[in-house]
A protein has these predicted regions:
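N-terminal secretory signal peptides that target proteins for export/translocation
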Residues: 1-17
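Short hydrophobic transmembrane-like helices used for membrane targeting/insertion
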Residues: 3-5, 25, 30, 142
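Bacterial N-terminal signal peptides
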Residues: 12, 20-32
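N-terminal soluble domains immediately following signal/targeting peptides that reside
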Residues: 38-188
Length: 188
């Protein structure tokens, strides 16, 4: 009888350990697949900041570096090494600024397209940043009730489900709009 109990105990503990191991492996797989899936949800963030010190409108586009490299290869038809090649970074920066437009929407006046200057790009960790600026913006708009009309189609020609979040920071608060499927031009 003692042997049977020990054997039963052994079988139960072995099965429990196997189940626990399987659950650990399954949990790890679920966690890893969620992390990978989370990155598959293509999103870029653009920040528009009214800089009262310089009087300019600063535009900062943040894209996942991995997405930028894949998109650059698809758009330009050959592999682009954005990490190592300044030329590839500049080429992709040009792509970004050509898919972003902004206009001033002052009540009672026709839309006034703004012409941001391209300042450059840089890599910061897992992100590629692309910078633009509209100089002398604040001084020319003092006292006007205005909205910005924004077009942000960055990466949407590569991935139609691409989501582009635009955060506009002014007067101490942030307003956001999200460009997703079907949204071509939004006001903020």
């Amino acid at each position: 009888m003692r042997v049977a109990i020990s054997r039963t105990f052994f079988l139960r503990t072995t099965l429990a350990a196997k189940r626990a191991g399987l659950f650990s492996v399954a949990g790890l797989l679920i966690f890893c697949s969620a992390a990978v899936y989370g990155h598959q949800q293509k999103t870029a963030v653009t920040r528009l900041l009214f800089n009262s010190n310089t009087g300019s409108l600063e535009i900062m586009h943040r894209l996942f570096l991995h997405d930028a490299e894949h998109a650059a290869s698809a758009v330009f038809g050959e592999k682009q090494d954005i990490i190592e090649s300044p030329d590839s970074r500049a080429l992709f920066g040009s792509y970004v600024v050509n898919r972003f437009a902004i206009a001033l929407d002052v009540q009672g006046e026709p839309l006034q397209e703004l012409k941001p200057h391209y300042l450059g790009e840089e890599i910061d960790g897992q992100y590629l940043w692309v910078y633009q600026e509209v100089p002398n913006f604040a001084t020319s708009q003092v006292g006007k009730s205005l909205q910005l009309r924004v077009i942000n189609s960055v990466l949407r020609d590569v991935w139609p489900d691409q989501s582009n979040l635009v955060n506009v920071e002014r007067g101490g608060h942030v307003e956001s709009v999200t460009f997703s499927v079907g949204a071509d031009s939004l006001s903020v």
